[in-house]
Amino acid sequence: MKNLYTKEKLTEEINQVRKQIGHEELEIHIEDIYYNEKENELWIITQDRPDKSAIIGKGGWVVGKLREKLKINSIHVESYGDYLTKEYKLKLSKKTLDEFNSDLTGIQNLKKILSSKLENIYSFDYNSYFESNIFKESEKTEAVVALSGGVDSSFSLILAKYLGFNPTAVTIDPGTIILPNQYKRNIKKLTDQLNAGHEYIKADYSEIIRESLNGRFHPCGRCSKHTEELINQYAINNNIPIVIFGDMLSTGTQCITPQEKGLYRLNLPASLAVGKQ
């Protein structure tokens, strides 16, 4: 990886773009620049969030025009403070997993990817990582992945598969009002592509739906709780030690937590400090 521009030259280019689209010129502070020649991607690390906002511009116009001008496939703009936060979360996750006494294949591989991400905090790329790091899959199923068909749970299943957990995906099916047919099509396509086992569990959420429509409570908490209970019970019944959820909030010390009967919950995206990006 090499730098395409100096900080000064890049700041000049940014302000030229800002001027062209009617934005005022600003003093922009860039902490660091990383260019991935293979992917033709540029990372701009700013000193603070206002600098990040200045580079992105209203509606993303500045960074979009900058990408076109520099003929770059993709430009990522992050503030240095955000990376410090991410680094801190990753270190906490690594500490938590290092203290988790387990010889599970998937857990050991998760520790490896955590270390690699800490070493390449600015420019870590999952596609490139898994192209050059192919992990042996566990002979036994080590994890159940709660798969809703949405982005977070789908990403969790992909990660679990590539990390060697030999996962089985389980989808709670309360009917089309909660699980539309489009999500079922997404689920089938993904599990087929990954060659991952998958099961549906029929569930009755009618009371939760009825009471929420009557305004008695917000459905998310109760729906989520009931889903977790069903997923956990499936794992216990099948002697599978880990349940994986696509939670992105339970980072660091909460990335893996004990449940009932020796079961553990792993919030896989959160353990890797993955955000909505």
Task: List where the protein language model places each region.
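A short amphipathic beta-strand at an alpha->beta junction
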Residues: 67-89
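ATP-dependent adenylation/pyrophosphate-handling site
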Residues: 134-188
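A short interface-forming secondary-structure element
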Residues: 39-61
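A short, basic/flexible loop-to-alpha-helix module at the beginning of a structural domain
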Residues: 110-141
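N-terminal presequence-like segments and adjacent domain-start helices
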Residues: 1-13
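A conserved beta-strand->alpha-helix junction
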Residues: 57, 184-216, 247
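Short edge beta-strands and adjacent turn/loop segments
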Residues: 19-45
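Active-site adenylate/phosphate-handling loop in enzymes that bind or generate adenylated species
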Residues: 208, 214-277
